[in-house]
Amino acid sequence: EDQAEIVGVFHSHPNHPPTPSQADLASCEYLDLPFYIVTPETSDWYYFEPSGYEKSLIGREWVWDIQDCWSLITDWYKQKKNIVIKHWKRPKSPKEFSESPLFEYGLPKVGFVEIDENDETEVGDVLLMDTTNTGKLDHVALYVGDQTILQHCVKRLSSRETYDQKWIECTKKRYRYAQ
């Protein structure tokens, strides 16, 4: 990037057809670059360009920094509120992130403010959670009303879930987008 203009993304799907995954389609949109996918064993190629693809909020595969709990929040705000949340620099891997979660740092930088524990939870509030009981705030979910959250846990598909006692106990802080 510092030495020349990036004109496309080339990558392979070993032992699989070159059909784009949800993450490929999302990355293509995010980077605004054409993608070329090859299956090395067969030399089959697939080419595609940004086309306005929007990821579904429910049922997406978990991929760090592309389709994870934080990207679910930003995608919900874009799709439901027409608000584009700025990206903030995150560690390159989930392992690095787990050692030093940065949600408390990142949320205020992109327009969220912590809300008082006495305030009612509203649709669109971000719930900052400690899911490992280690004191590290390692997960975010989105309150969508009617005691329901939208979330994307590691190695699971994104889903709506009841905001029950388990998730309430994991919730340590709540943030609201300050428009």
Predicted regions: what they are:
Residues 82-95:
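Short acidic alpha-helical/loop segments enriched in Asp/Glu that coordinate divalent cations
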Residues 63-80:
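Active-site nucleophilic cysteine motif
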Residues 92-158:
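...with weaker cross-activation on analogous glycine-rich loops/strands in unrelated enzymes
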Residues 30-54:
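Divalent-metal-activated hydrolytic enzyme cores
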Residues 52-62:
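Short, flexible active-site loops
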Residues 161-179:
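Glycine- and charge-enriched low-complexity intrinsically disordered segments
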